[in-house]
């Protein structure tokens, strides 16, 4: 189950903050996941480690290419397309489905005021809730 959820990552994960005025104009963002919660039917939700969730803790959001990529930290390189991006006065809202054959979807919201990241990954039998921070990259 965790393997089917894995590698979506946001994460998000989405730790410094940048001013809101320039945040949406940047080309990419570095995001670190700080907390992960796994939720399943009957047993509910519990906090798990990034490793147990089989997630990468640091991701890059490339706004120009509309991709969510693993940070180049020596691990396996992955990139998932971002299906939709919406920018409001207060947030950047992202959505994607990763590998289509895995019956999963993910979404994320990044605060333009604080850089806080909240994200979720849903599959047929479970979901992950992710919390973290993002910062604009030069």
What spans do the regions from the language model cover?
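Positively charged n-region of N-terminal signal peptides that target proteins for export
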Residues: 1-7
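Bacterial N-terminal signal peptides
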Residues: 7-19
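Boundary at the C-terminal end of the N-terminal hydrophobic targeting segment
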Residues: 20-26
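Short, solvent-exposed loop/hinge segments that bridge or flank secondary-structure elements
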Residues: 28-66
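Short, solvent-exposed aromatic-acidic interface loops
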Residues: 35-38, 70-78, 123-128
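Contiguous, well-ordered beta-strand patches that form the walls/edges
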Residues: 64-103
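Short, exposed beta-strand-loop hairpins at the edges of beta-sheets
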Residues: 109, 117-129
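Short, low-complexity, Pro/Ser/Thr/Gly-rich segments in the mature regions of secreted, periplasmic
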Residues: 129-137
